[in-house]
Amino acid sequence: MKVDYYEILGVTRECDDKKLKSAFRKLAMQYHPDRNAGDKEAERRFKEIGEAYEVLKDPQKRAAYDRFGHAAFENNNQGGGNPFGGFAAGGFSDIFEDFFGEIMGGGHRKRSDGRERGADLSYNMEVTLEEAFSGKTAQINIPSSIVCDSCEGSGAKKGSKPQICGTCHGAGRVRAAQGFFSIERTCHACNGRGEVITDPCPKCQGTRRVEKNRSLSVNIPAGIEDGTRIRLSGEGDAGIRGGPNGDLYIFLSVKPHEFFQREGADLHCRIPLSMVTAALGGEFEVSDLDGIKARVKIPEGTQNGRQFRLKGKGMPMLRRQQVRGDLYIHITIETPQKLTQEQRELLQKFEKLSNHENSPQSHGFFSRMKEFFENISGQN
């Protein structure tokens, strides 16, 4: 007993053409003979999927199937006959040829004239934060494949030329019969090129290309970030038989800086201050990455972790280089170490002279803590 066509494709009877085609594509790829060589069950499912789609993709056949089921397509020689006359081998061939031609093409398949696009190349480059700030022009050397100058890219020895492939007759594809439909595959004799080289070029060994180091000038724009990718069109490996060159991708990483940390277009810098400067106030100079200095005033009583913002002193934005981020100064207060006896005595004297107004947070905290423990003792 035949399985329901909708069940075969895993769709409902109400599904539209788009869902029907999507289900067919998924199953056809899953059970394609190229992916399941020698698997008879996969071959059976593949044929079954094609048969179901052949009916359901056609509005008239689908309407007849919805009304009469499989009986609509049986040649039982009874009155009136079968208006559809069963399935023709050509129908399946057309379905799979269109489907797999669309899927396997997609810009990756070799052209019918044998032209192939060259491979893309990648290059990793490390730059300093200063170079990321101002931009630079860098010279790089990359190993790549270029067209062989001895055979001019034909792959054949001088005085000879490639021969048309006797298996595919220059098409680059061959058809293999699978029951009542045929499958188109890449020709194994010429790897889809449509030609074979019987007398290869001694320089490139028939590959049509040779390896060579090339020197390139790369423009690094100001404002690039760690992980930025630059694409140089046509600077990858050479194409074959007049095919386009691949592209070169430059992947940039920015070295950690001694003083500045970066967050987007903003820069952050930690400045240590002595306890005395933080208490009495003062000022200091700081330079941004273009060397311009700015004076930062420290008010009396500056606390650890305080932040100062210098507008427009950060990094330029990659796509709006006239706009810059900000520079944030983070204050860290340095507690004195290895005190002399005199320094220790002075600090102890300072502590005795201090009151809660000098250190409101610590005074208030310890007062509350003392009160807390006194209450606990009183309860016990």
From Swiss-Prot:
One GO MF term: unfolded protein binding
The record ties this protein, via Pfam families, to: DnaJ (PF00226), DnaJ_C (PF01556), DnaJ_CXXCXGXG (PF00684)
Free-text comment on the cofactor: Binds 2 Zn(2+) ions per monomer.
**Keyword Metal-binding belongs to the record:** yes
- What residues does Zn(2+) 1 bind to? 148, 151, 201, 204
| Gene3D superfamilies in the record | DnaJ domain (1.10.287.110), Heat shock protein DnaJ, cysteine-rich domain (2.10.230.10), Urease metallochaperone UreE, N-terminal domain (2.60.260.20)
What is the required cofactor set for this protein? Answer: Zn(2+)
Keyword annotations for this protein? Answer: Chaperone, Cytoplasm, DNA replication, Metal-binding, Repeat, Stress response, Zinc, Zinc-finger
Q: Which residues form the J domain?
A: 4-69
Which residues of this UniProt protein bind Zn(2+) 2? 165, 168, 187, 190
- Residue spans, zinc finger CR-type: 135-213
What's a GO biological-process term for it?
Answer: DNA replication
> Where in the cell?
Cytoplasm
- Indicate the principal place this protein occupies in or around the cell: cytoplasm
Q: Can you quote a single GO CC term? A: cytoplasm
CXXCXGXG motif repeat ranges, renumbered to this chain: 148-155, 165-172, 187-194, 201-208
The protein's matches in SUPFAM superfamilies, at most eight in alphabetical order, are given as: Chaperone J-domain, DnaJ/Hsp40 cysteine-rich domain, HSP40/DnaJ peptide-binding domain
User: What does the subunit comment say?
Assistant: Homodimer.
The written remark on domains in the entry is:
The J domain is necessary and sufficient to stimulate DnaK ATPase activity. Zinc center 1 plays an important role in the autonomous, DnaK-independent chaperone activity of DnaJ. Zinc center 2 is essential for interaction with DnaK and for DnaJ activity.
Function (record text): Participates actively in the response to hyperosmotic and heat shock by preventing the aggregation of stress-denatured proteins and by disaggregating proteins, also in an autonomous, DnaK-independent fashion. Unfolded proteins bind initially to DnaJ; upon interaction with the DnaJ-bound protein, DnaK hydrolyzes its bound ATP, resulting in the formation of a stable complex. GrpE releases ADP from DnaK; ATP binding to DnaK triggers the release of the substrate protein, thus completing the reaction cycle.
Q: Sorted alphabetically, which NCBIfam families does this protein's record hold?
A: DnaJ_bact (TIGR02349), PRK10767.1 (NF008035)
Q: Which PANTHER family match?
A: CHAPERONE PROTEIN DNAJ, DNAJ HOMOLOG 1, MITOCHONDRIAL-RELATED
Which protein family is it in? Belongs to the DnaJ family.
Protein name as catalogued: Chaperone protein DnaJ
Q: What is the lineage of its organism?
A: Bacteria, Pseudomonadati, Pseudomonadota, Alphaproteobacteria, Hyphomicrobiales
